[in-house]
Structure formats: C-alpha cells, structure tokens
Regions:
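Non-catalytic cell-wall polysaccharide-engagement segments
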Residues: 2-19, 23-92, 182-291
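Export/targeting segments at the very N-terminus of extracytoplasmic proteins
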Residues: 73-160
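Substrate-binding clefts and substrate-entry loops adjacent to catalytic sites
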Residues: 122-125, 162-194
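Residue-level detector of functional hotspots within protein domains
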Residues: 59-60, 133, 167
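Hydrophobic/aromatic-lined pockets within catalytic cores
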Residues: 157-164, 208-212
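Short, solvent-exposed secondary-structure capping/transition elements
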Residues: 150-153, 164-169, 216
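Residue-level signal for alpha-helical context at structural boundaries
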Residues: 103, 173, 221-222
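Solvent-exposed, acidic/flexible segments
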Residues: 78, 127-135, 144-149, 171-174, ...
Length: 291
C-alpha cells in the first residue's frame, strides 16, 4: 500500500482526494446552494435568520400636536372594504414567523368574537362568531362603531407593533392588550376587555365616549389644556389647544404629547404614543390631516 501511495498515480489520486475533501468542507461551511443541491444539504438555510415582515418607519414630518388627525378621517368607517383590510394585513404581515410561545401571526390568527348589542357608542352591534380573522374583526368593529378601520390598524401597531410582530417579538400578550384598552403598561388587562376582539371594540367605543361626552374628560377640543410630556412629572407639560374631537380623543386615550426632542431621536422625557400614531398613519395611508 505504501508503495502505491508513493507512486505517481498514488500521489495524483491522494492529491485529488485531498482537494475534494477540502472543497466539500468549504461548501458546507459557507452554506453554498450548490452544496445543498448536490449533497442533500437543503436545510442549510434553516440556520439563517428567519424571515420577518419589513419594518415600518413612522413618518412624523408635519406633526402638529394640536391636530393629529382630522375628524373626517378618524370617523370614516368606509375608508377600506373588508377585502382591502384583508389584503393590507396580508401584505404588511408577509414573512411573519409564529411567536416562540406558538402565537399565530396577525395574518393567520383567528378569534372567537363575543356578541355585542347595539349601543349608543357602537350602534351597529356585533354578532357572536368563531374562527374570525384579524382583518374581519377590524372590519366588524369599524362598521359597528363608525370608526375608520385604518385608525384601528394604526392603533394596534402603535400599541403592540402587531402589524409586523414576528418570532421573538410576537407573544400572546400582544393580542391580549392589542389596543392598550384597560391594560396598564406593567400589569394584566381587565379580563372583561382582554383579547383582540374585545380590545378593538373597547377602544372604538371609548373614542365615541370621548366624542359624546367631551366635558367628562381632560382634553376638550378648542379649549387650552396643559398636556404632559411624560408620566414623569419632572418632564413638565405644554399648553395645547386641540383643533378637533379626534385629536382630543387621542390625548384622552394616551395622555401625553411628544416634546421637542422627539424630532431628534427623543430623550428621557419623550413619549412616543401620539407621535407614532400620526407617523404610522402617514407611512401606511398618507397624511391624516388635510393640507
């Protein structure tokens, strides 16, 4: 055997085998598609970063603390059809991976919807149903409560990032507190309002409470009001005379305004809620205020 290896043929063969071995090692180490196809390593790509929806960047250019969104936009329940909502959710949520706890992505999740009788705040009422998609929940609530479905879409993203939540950033809590309604930041939601359908219905009905009984709330349209910059009282407040009911409702729902630092990346006193509502709405649907 040793004499064969020392012969010219043996040397050439040994060199060839060594070269082949090195090539195979390199192909496998680099995850080459050629290696995967030729050698059955088709799962090599599984070790890469899972795909995820494209991130949404809020466009807050033109933000006006006194006029975040026009009434005509906020209460336009016909802004999108059921089919348009479904197509929108499928598009922005494309690439989503289920959460590590098994939570389904927004585009594929389904929910049981509780019956809601017609009320002063949501005159349309809602019928009980099961296996309802997120898009259909949004449509049903928008029609029952006379609110723009775009507002609900922006709200669930501003509160929980649900339009693009994926993998490690997606959990059951995101649906439980989808709209931030009756849910303290660091505590459990009121069980009566926990869950995606109840969150949307509760938030939509609350915005009409603000509209129908404005004097019972802190921020009233056309009345000068000091609005805090942060939950930290040391960050101060600024006077705002909001232009319309929709903007007043947003401040009653999220009682902080962005400070000047928000336009430059923010600081320890920046509250992003209403800034992001405006910014995400503009990114996704165009300006929420007329020129």
């Amino acid at each position: 055997m040793q004499s064969f290896l020392k012969s010219p043929i043996g040397v050439v063969l040994a060199a060839f085998l060594a070269t082949l071995l090195v090539g195979l090692i390199v192909l496998r180490a680099t995850g080459s598609s050629l290696g995967g196809l030729a050698l059955g390593w088709g799962k090599a790509a599984d070790t890469g970063t899972p795909s995820a929806p494209a991130p949404l960047v809020p466009d807050a250019s033109g933000f006006n603390a006194a006029r975040i969104i026009d009434d005509e936009v906020f209460y336009d329940s016909q802004a999108m059809t059921r089919e348009e909502i479904a197509a929108f959710v499928a598009r922005v949520n494309a690439g989503c991976q289920p959460g590590s706890d098994g939570t389904e992505c927004l585009a594929t999740a389904t929910f049981s919807v509780q019956a809601r009788p017609a009320s002063t705040f949501c005159p349309g009422g809602i019928e009980a149903a099961s296996g309802v998609s997120a898009a259909d929940v949004i449509w049903e609530v928008s029609q029952a409560c006379d609110i723009n479905p775009q507002v609900l879409l922006v709200l669930i993203h501003k509160e929980q990032g649900l339009l693009t939540a994926s993998g490690a950033s997606l959990s059951a809590r995101d649906y439980e507190a989808a709209a931030g309604y009756a849910c303290p930041d660091h505590g459990a939601c009121d069980p009566q309002w926990a869950g995606f359908p109840s969150q949307l219905y509760g938030a939509a009905s609350q915005f009409h409470r603000y509209r129908l009984d404005p004097g019972s709330y802190d921020v009233v349209a056309q009345r000068p009001t000091r609005i805090a910059y942060s939950p930290d009282a040391q960050c101060g407040s600024g006077e705002v005379t909001v232009a319309n009911q929709a903007t007043a409702g947003l401040y009653n729902y999220t009682p902080f305004q962005p400070n000047e630092a928000a336009a430059h990346g923010g600081d320890q006193c920046t509250s992003w809620g209403n800034w992001n509502f405006y910014g995400y709405f503009k990114t996704l649907f165009g300006s929420p205020t007329s020129a």
